[in-house]
Curated annotation (Swiss-Prot):
SMART domains: KOW (SM00739). PANTHER family: MITOCHONDRIAL RIBOSOMAL PROTEIN L24 (PTHR12903). GO terms for cellular component: ribonucleoprotein complex; ribosome. Signal peptide: none annotated. This is Large ribosomal subunit protein uL24. The keyword Ribosomal protein applies. One of its GO terms (molecular function) is structural constituent of ribosome. Part of the 50S ribosomal subunit. Belongs to the universal ribosomal protein uL24 family. The keyword RNA-binding applies. The gene is rplX. It comes from Streptococcus agalactiae serotype V (strain ATCC BAA-611 / 2603 V/R).
Amino acid sequence: MFVKKGDKVRVIAGKDKGTEAVVLKALPKVNKVVVEGVALIKKHQKPNNENPQGAIVEKEAPIHVSNVQVLDKNGVAGRVGYKVVDGKKVRYNKKSGEVLD
């Protein structure tokens, strides 16, 4: 999967289209990512010792990795490619040519 935790991405599809945020978690087995402030859902929590009343908590839901594009340091969104630099495999932005790792 071309997206890693900590990458800055732009959402390119869905209700949050155009949003730029940071990847909080990558889920490679299901090809999904959790992006900060995107795809918020309301989760009902049962009452417990910490919260005797229970609560409705907003949290980020995973979105499919095909709905995001990785941004480079200059904010250019593009597809991700791989190349070998100094004997090390690195990711780079195909549009700008800038190395991401």
